[in-house]
Amino acid sequence: MIINNQNSPQSINTPSSVSSRQHINKSKKKKENVIKRMLIRLSNSNNRSLATVFGVIGGLVLGIVLVCKEYENFPLVGKGLPLVYRIVGIFLSAGTGGNLSSYIGGTIDIITGDKTVVDLYKSFKRYFKKVKDKNHRSPIPLTNLNNNNNNNNNNNNNNNNNNNNNNNNNNNNNNNNNNNSGGSGSTDNNNNNNEPIFSNNNSNNNNDNNSDLEIPIPI
């Protein structure tokens, strides 16, 4: 185990060593701050600027790959061309990629209303969260649905039975009304039948009166 004495020359912090450490720390912080600022600016920038940056980087990488492979159909990169033309071809590739990406990013800005990438990411995240919540909601059990359907069917059957009972009651009332009308007809018949009875009584009375008359017998 090594113990550093305070009086040893290694443990003594000279002003030059302290300043050099501070300078290194400051330079690291500056680099981190620069990268952080660039990322923040890119995230807060519109889609056209962001797409242009990535398009230029992508076109540059594509141009370098095509030059290294000596792709003949790519302009200013074919075999036998000097190195200057190839470098120009790489820059043309980067510019073409940047222009195309700029058009695409501008179209996205028009559609989304100049929303940044962060805003688009948050909106997509909220949308997928809503969809996930809807899918994870507990569905209604099938037994409850079947019970509800059976109850509805029973209610319908009861309503039909009540309607049938009402119809039967109406029919019974109609039959009673018909019976009452038939009874009035029978009384008329009885009255009609009684009429000859009165006539018979009259004839009987006449016969009785005739029997009381004295008929003279001739001698």
Curated annotation (Swiss-Prot):
GO terms for cellular component: membrane. It is found in: Membrane. Coiled coil: none annotated. Residues 1-17, 144-212 have a biased composition (Low complexity). The chain crosses the membrane at residues 49-69, 83-105. The keyword Lipoprotein does not apply. Its main location: membrane. Residues 1-31, 135-219 are annotated as: Disordered. PANTHER family: MYND-TYPE DOMAIN-CONTAINING PROTEIN, NF-KAPPA-B-REPRESSING FACTOR-RELATED. This is Putative uncharacterized protein DDB_G0285135. The lineage of its organism: Eukaryota, Amoebozoa, Evosea, Eumycetozoa, Dictyostelia.
